[in-house]
């Protein structure tokens, strides 16, 4: 199972670095920062499906 350590999030701004992750909502997130901010917003219901685009 793929996991991402989201401790230290949310962050107020994310870089434009493109290292895509696919969330359990079947949405592609551009990088770990964008994904982890969304995880925090979802109150932990969003998880990582896999690395790379959905």
Swiss-Prot record:
Listed InterPro entries: Bifunctional_prot_inhibitor (IPR051597), Kazal_dom (IPR002350), Kazal_dom_sf (IPR036058), Prot_inh_Kazal-m (IPR001239)
Origin: domain of life: Eukaryota
Molecular function, one GO term: serine-type endopeptidase inhibitor activity
Keyword list, A-Z: Disulfide bond, Glycoprotein, Protease inhibitor, Repeat, Secreted, Serine protease inhibitor
High-level lineage: Eukaryota, Metazoa, Chordata, Craniata, Vertebrata
Annotated site, Reactive bond 3, chain positions: 16-17
One Pfam entry name: Kazal_1
PROSITE patterns per the UniProt record, alphabetical: KAZAL_1, KAZAL_2
Domain Kazal-like: 4-54
Protein's recorded name: Ovomucoid
Comment, domains: Avian ovomucoid consists of three homologous, tandem Kazal family inhibitory domains.
Disulfide bonds: 6-36, 14-33, 22-54
Organism of provenance: Aix galericulata
Intracellular or extracellular location(s): Secreted
Keyword Nucleus belongs to the record: no
Record carries keyword Secreted: yes
GO cellular component entries: extracellular region
SUPFAM superfamilies for the chain: Kazal-type serine protease inhibitors
Glycosylation sites: 43
